[in-house]
């Protein structure tokens, strides 16, 4: 009982005054090494906008979604976040940066959890250096979005909150 409202849990939904509200979706957005420099780093490739600024746009587009953002330049910290939220969130949007092409450990972490993930890259990694063409993460993800700039994050969130 909250005030004069009676709440009870029914199949992960909340009943309030006889109406059913769907549970709030929770999405984790993970950015890897050097992505803290968006807006400053190689603007011809990554653009002029910081990710923190762009995150406000995503939050405005999805007001009913809890977006949790985490960036780290350290592989173990990214793995810890996947472990922390990989069983109770509705989706993970991951741009592991250069770890995409080197980290079996992050791939194993994605494979060990039940939360679906979408891999995102701001630039078209297939049009860049050959060592960027292979992803260890892709086989562990529901999909991959590359080369669409920051919009790729929005598309990933949209997919993960859909019922597909």
What is each PLM-predicted segment?
Residues 24-27:
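Extreme N-terminal starter segment of soluble prokaryotic enzymes
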Residues 37-52:
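Glycine- and acidic-residue-enriched helix-capping/strand-helix junction motifs
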Residues 68-76:
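Short beta->alpha junction loops
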Residues 85-92:
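Short acidic/histidine-rich motifs immediately flanking catalytic phosphotransfer sites
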Residues 103-113:
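Short Gly/Thr/Asp-enriched flexible loops that form oxyanion-binding sites at enzyme active sites
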Residues 112-128:
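Short, acidic/small-residue loops that bind anionic groups at enzyme active sites
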Residues 127-164:
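Short, glycine-/small-residue-rich phosphate/pyrophosphate-handling segment
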């Amino acid at each position: 009982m909250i005030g004069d409202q009676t709440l009870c849990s029914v199949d992960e939904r909340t009943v309030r005054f006889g109406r059913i509200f769907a549970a709030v979706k929770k999405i984790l957005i993970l950015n890897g090494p050097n992505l803290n420099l968006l807006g400053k780093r190689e603007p011809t490739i990554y653009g002029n906008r910081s990710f923190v600024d762009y995150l406000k746009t995503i939050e405005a587009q999805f007001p009913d979604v809890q977006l949790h953002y985490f960036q780290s330049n350290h592989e173990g910290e990214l793995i810890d976040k996947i472990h922390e939220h990989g069983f109770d969130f509705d989706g993970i949007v991951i741009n592991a940066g250069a770890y995409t092409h080197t980290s079996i450990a992050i791939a194993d972490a994605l494979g060990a959890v039940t939360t679906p993930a979408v891999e995102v890259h701001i630039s078209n990694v297939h049009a860049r250096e050959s060592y960027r063409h292979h992803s260890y993460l892709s086989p562990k993800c529901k999909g991959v979005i590359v080369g669409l700039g920051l919009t790729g994050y929005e598309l990933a969130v949209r997919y993960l909150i859909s019922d597909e």
